[in-house]
UniProtKB/Swiss-Prot annotation:
Record-linked InterPro entries: Ribosomal_uL10, Ribosomal_uL10-like_sf, Ribosomal_uL10_bac_type
Complexes and interactors: Component of the mitochondrial ribosome large subunit (39S) which comprises a 16S rRNA and about 50 distinct proteins.
Biological-process GO terms, alphabetical: translation
Any GO molecular function: structural constituent of ribosome
Gene3D superfamilies: 3.30.70.1730
Name this protein carries in UniProt: Large ribosomal subunit protein uL10m
Organism for this UniProt entry: Drosophila pseudoobscura pseudoobscura
Presequence positions on this chain: 1-24
Similarity comment: Belongs to the universal ribosomal protein uL10 family.
GO cellular component, one term: ribonucleoprotein complex
Subcellular localization: Mitochondrion
Keywords: Mitochondrion, Ribonucleoprotein, Ribosomal protein, Transit peptide
Length: 253
């Protein structure tokens, strides 16, 4: 019955039209678009904003300085700056490294190895470092923070050997300088400081040198007395032998 109705009434069947979209123009030129219509161009020209023109006498550097001056100081930066200042004041060893391209996993492994040796790896922004060292004896380290960097703090300056041993296996960390016992040292001076013996060894060597000098002094003071005693002993033995020979000759006579 349905087939009969479809044959008798062809309008009852639904057919989906086949559509195909075609572009009869070339590619859209984004870099050099076609000029808009006159009416549209006039509307665009009217709606464009007008900015106040700066005087020609003002340079770009002055404008940038004014923009920087207008920025408000972040209180959190002051907190981090106090933390950096606290690390600098309570650390006997501060090593500054230039940090090349390195993955997060590698820097994490280095941080763990340093932490086992009581060495703490930190990284701060240049603005925070500047805020922390301004007006302090550490202001001379600012030229070392012009690029990506990291800092290692330690309360024991004798850990310089362990620090160099760990960072020698990480070529991405380049030693620039450091602070040892409130004294700024270069890279070569830090390397030389690491080759020096520890404090206990130096004290033992000093005690040995002092004992050797005291022993030599006593020996030199007793030299003449010992020589005199030896000469007198030889002289006494010589006189005794002479007296013995004289007595024997007298008895034979």
């Amino acid at each position: 019955m349905a087939n009969l109705m479809q044959r008798s009434l062809p309008l009852t069947t639904t057919r989906t039209p086949v559509l195909q979209f075609l572009r009869f123009r070339g590619k859209i030129n984004i870099q050099r678009p076609k000029e808009p219509h006159y009416e549209r161009a006039r509307v665009v020209a009217v709606t464009q904003p007008k900015y106040p023109e700066l005087p020609k006498a003002r340079s770009c550097f002055q404008t940038r300085a004014e923009r920087t001056k207008e920025q408000l100081e972040n209180p959190y930066n002051e907190i981090i700056a106090r933390e950096v200042r606290n690390w600098l004041n309570h650390s006997q060893l501060v090593a500054i490294f230039h940090l090349n391209s390195i993955t997060a996993d590698e820097i994490f492994r280095v941080r763990v190895q340093l932490h086992k040796q009581n060495l703490h790896l930190k990284s701060y922004g240049r603005k925070i470092i500047d805020q922390a060292v301004t007006g302090t004896p550490y202001e001379a380290i600012m030229p070392l923070f012009h690029s990506n960097h990291c800092i290692v703090f330690s309360p024991n300056q004798q850990q310089i050997g362990a620090l160099l041993k760990i960072t020698r296996r990480v070529p991405q960390m380049v030693l620039l300088g450091g602070i040892v016992e409130k004294t700024l040292l270069s890279r070569n001076e830090l390397m030389a400081y690491a080759q020096m013996p520890n404090l206990q060894g130096a004290q033992a060597q000093l005690v040995q040198t002092l004992n050797l000098a005291a022993g030599q002094l006593v020996q030199h003071l007793q030299t003449h007395q010992a020589n005199l005693v030896q000469v007198l002993d030889v002289h006494a033995k010589g006189n005794g032998d002479t007296n013995t020979n004289t007595t024997e000759t007298a008895d034979e006579s």
